[in-house]
């Protein structure tokens, strides 16, 4: 019975994909969203079938400086919200060695509001801009397997530049380049105590933004989760976090701040709820991460609210 419950709970956990968040790289920003890879039991394969998911991602932060639209911006304050709608399909025994395979498609609508200062030959000027539009879509594929008491998952996410982008705008929902993220997740879950430990390292590669001649560097990220599951009560709680580091320099004529390598560390609480009224078909995840350490990036807080329904 407990394994059945776990199978229903994890139906949302393979659905969490990164969207446009503000980090290092161009405008100190990246496709990687902290806390998106390791939530609750990320390595455990979900049941076969189709799942619809809605994710709401929040970020509010500040940075001393970054480059946007070919100009150096200082004293930056940004507020970001994304509403991501997606669908996944899970095949229990795929042709890939008989292991569970999942694919998914996600399309976001985002709102970005930025305030900053720009220096010109005529002095410094305060700027502000906001926009709401379609964001960059995500395609993903995940392969699950188990060895002993450890569950594993490898995921490849492709970020497609379908979002709105204008070079000289201060705020853009789209990023105008492709991103490729490979993540490997591991989960240990003790079914008697309900204690879970998960780890999810990953690496992100970016193509060049041809409009600004800005090549964002390669990004390494690792996420961790220590969770406690209460199977009979239909919920779980956890302490979760992330470490992020840019491992290669930004480049191109648009990289006016040089290498601009960024790094960050954050941690915070999370809760998973599978309401009994949903008969195991509905799962809700809420999460809030506090940015504790940062360099060359917007620093602030990250929020997630995810609702999924298995058809």
Across the structure, where does each feature detected by a protein language model lie?
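Detector for outer-membrane/organellar transmembrane beta-barrel domains
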Residues: 151-157, 164-251, 273
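Extracellular loop and loop/strand-boundary signature of outer-membrane beta-barrel proteins
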Residues: 39, 69-75, 122-128, 166-172, ...
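Residues that define the transmembrane beta-barrel architecture of outer-membrane proteins
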Residues: 77-85, 99, 128-137, 174-180, ...
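Outer membrane beta-barrel transmembrane domains
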Residues: 28, 32, 210-311
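Residues on the lipid-exposed face of transmembrane beta-strands in outer-membrane beta-barrel proteins
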Residues: 42, 54, 85-91, 138-145, ...
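Transmembrane beta-barrel strands of outer-membrane/channel proteins
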Residues: 52-60, 103-109, 154-160, 199-205, ...
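Surface-exposed strand-loop-strand hairpins of Gram-negative outer-membrane beta-barrel proteins
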Residues: 25-31, 58-82, 118-130
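Short loop/turn motifs that connect adjacent beta-strands in outer-membrane beta-barrel proteins
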Residues: 25-27, 41-49, 91-101, 116, ...
């Amino acid at each position: 019975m407990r394994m059945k419950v776990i199978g229903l709970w994890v139906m949302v956990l393979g659905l969490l994909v990164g969207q446009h968040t503000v980090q290092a790289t161009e405008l100190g920003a990246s496709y990687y969203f902290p806390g998106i890879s390791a939530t609750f039991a990320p390595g455990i394969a979900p049941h076969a079938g189709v799942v619809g998911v809605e994710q709401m991602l929040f970020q509010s932060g500040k940075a001393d400086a970054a480059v946007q639209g070919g100009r150096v911006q200082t004293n930056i304050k940004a507020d970001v919200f994304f509403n991501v709608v997606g669908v996944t399909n899970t095949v229990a025994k795929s042709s890939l060695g008989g292991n569970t395979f999942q694919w998914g498609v996600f399309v976001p609508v985002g709102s970005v509001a930025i305030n900053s200062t720009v220096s010109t030959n005529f002095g410094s000027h305060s700027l502000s801009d906001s926009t709401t539009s379609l964001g960059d879509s995500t395609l993903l594929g995940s392969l699950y397997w188990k060895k002993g008491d450890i569950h594993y998952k490898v995921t490849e996410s492709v970020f497609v530049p379908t979002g709105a982008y204008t070079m000289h705008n201060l705020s853009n929902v789209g990023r105008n380049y492709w991103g490729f993220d490979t993540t490997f997740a591991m989960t240990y879950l003790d079914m008697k105590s309900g204690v879970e430990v998960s780890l999810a390292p990953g690496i992100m590669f970016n193509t060049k933004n041809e409009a600004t001649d800005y090549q964002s560097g390669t990004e390494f990220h690792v996420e961790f989760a220590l969770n406690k599951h209460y199977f009979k009560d239909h919920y779980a709680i956890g302490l979760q976090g992330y470490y992020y580091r840019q491992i290669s320099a930004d480049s191109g004529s648009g990289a006016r701040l040089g290498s601009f390598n960024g790094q960050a560390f954050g941690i915070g609480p999370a809760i998973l709820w599978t309401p009994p009224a949903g008969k195991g078909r509905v799962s809700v995840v809420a999460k809030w991460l506090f940015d504790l350490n940062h360099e060359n990036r917007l620093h602030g807080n990250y929020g997630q609210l995810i609702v999924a329904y298995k058809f």
